[in-house]
Every structure is written in structure tokens, then in C-alpha cells.
Amino acid sequence: MRLTKKGGQDMDTLKILVVDDESRMRKLVKDFLTKKNFQVLEAGDGEEAMDIFYKEKDIALIILDVMMPKMDGWEVCREVRKNSKVPIIMLTARGDERDELLGFDLGVDEYISKPFSPKILVARVEAILRRTGQTGAEDVLSAGGIVIDKAA
């Protein structure tokens, strides 16, 4: 099944910002997301993430680490929430219950502790995008060359 944005655009037009100070982690997440035709933007710290977030007006979702130099993930989340309701997934080694609860208090949509399954991460990304109405996946199905538009 192929996910599309409302209006029929492919998901490859959806931008996901991946923020982690470890380049290997960003590459791993990016590889799995690009296989699903997402466009991935990367930031190595919180300040860079905020620069990209304000420059790119159409970011569909943010995947955010907590422990980073310059500006941590908590502060990035606070700043983003001042101006936007863009979905945020925390992807972090901080698996303590207090950290997870703090994330939800700050407005994250999902909290995933490392180590994690990249396939589950992608499934959660797709589920959040469907729930937030950024895709019309429930309206348009495509399988074996057959396209069904439920809204038609």
C-alpha cells in the first residue's frame, strides 16, 4: 500500500527532520525512512535543528534525540511547541520513566527508547502522520496497479 498526502501527492514530498548528534544514528534512521520515500533532513544538534525548522516551512515530523550539544532535545521541543504542532518523536537512550513523562508533558507525540527497531520507528512515523491528517492514506489505496479512492 502506498501512502499519499491529501491531494494525491506521494509521501516523498513529506519532510522529516532527524535530529541526533550521532551521525551513524542519523544515517540509520534516514536509510529506513528514505526506503519509504520520505525526504529526510538532518541536524547534528539542537541549534542546527531549530535553524532548519524555521527555514523549512513544510516539515511534517521531527525525530529528536534528547542528549545533544548546544541545545538539548527538551529545549528544542519547548521551542517548536511555542510555534507549531508538528508531530515530534523522541528517540533517545534516556529510557527512565521520568524522562518519558517529561517528554509527554512537553508535547511529544511518541517516545522511543534506544535500542529500538527501525521498522517499528517507521511504522510509528506513518501512524502519526495518518492520525494528524498529513496523509490521505485512509482515502487512497493502491495495490497491484489498482487505485481505490474511498472519497470518490
Question: Where do the protein language model's features map onto the residues?
Answer:
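Short, Lys/Arg-enriched segments at the junction into DNA-binding effector domains
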Residues: L14-K15, A127-A152
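Active-site residues of response regulator receiver
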Residues: D20, D65, T92
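Charged docking surfaces used in two-component/phosphorelay signaling
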Residues: K27-K35
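Acidic, metal-coordinating helix/loop segments flanking the phosphotransfer/catalytic sites
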Residues: E42-L61
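Acidic catalytic/metal-coordinating carboxylates
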Residues: D45-E48, D72-E75, D99
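Short amphipathic alpha-helix used as the core "switch/output" element in two-component signaling
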Residues: D51, W74-K85
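Receiver (REC) domain active-site loop signature in two-component systems and cognate sites
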Residues: M68
